[in-house]
């Protein structure tokens, strides 16, 4: 099977940068009910939070790279890159807020767990 490279190269050169940077935001894990969760459930939830934080760090790096590329396009006079940059910045800020919320929810679950299990 012979692959035709010319159409593929053309498609890649006219693709917007957002399509090149396929940054996939991770799904936030559910927060456990600390008041009724077992220790094992809390430990599992902690692992999910840590995995989410690691995946979110990769996502933020991807979006940051996208923003850098858009800034370079802006510097070269590409006016349409301003909108793409703003969208990427909004995505970045939303991801930071989402991670902060996941951490706050898990901290609340830990407090509830400790209150329900004072030993």
Residue spans of the language-model regions?
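Classic N-terminal secretory signal peptides
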Residues: 2-22
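Compact alpha-helical subdomains of small soluble proteins
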Residues: 66-67, 71-119
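Short, structured coil/loop segments at alpha-helix boundaries
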Residues: 4, 39-42, 74-81
């Amino acid at each position: 099977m012979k692959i035709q490279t010319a159409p593929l190269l053309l498609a890649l050169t006219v693709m917007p940068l957002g399509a090149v940077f396929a940054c996939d935001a991770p799904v936030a894990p559910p927060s456990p009910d600390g008041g009724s969760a077992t220790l094992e459930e809390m430990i599992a939830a902690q692992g999910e939070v840590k995995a989410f934080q690691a995946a979110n760090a990769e996502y933020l790096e991807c979006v940051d790279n996208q923003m850098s590329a858009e800034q370079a396009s802006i510097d070269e006079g590409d006016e349409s890159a301003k909108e793409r940059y703003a969208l990427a910045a909004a995505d970045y800020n939303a991801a930071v807020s989402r991670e902060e919320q996941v951490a706050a929810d898990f901290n609340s679950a830990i407090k509830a767990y400790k209150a329900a299990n004072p030993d």
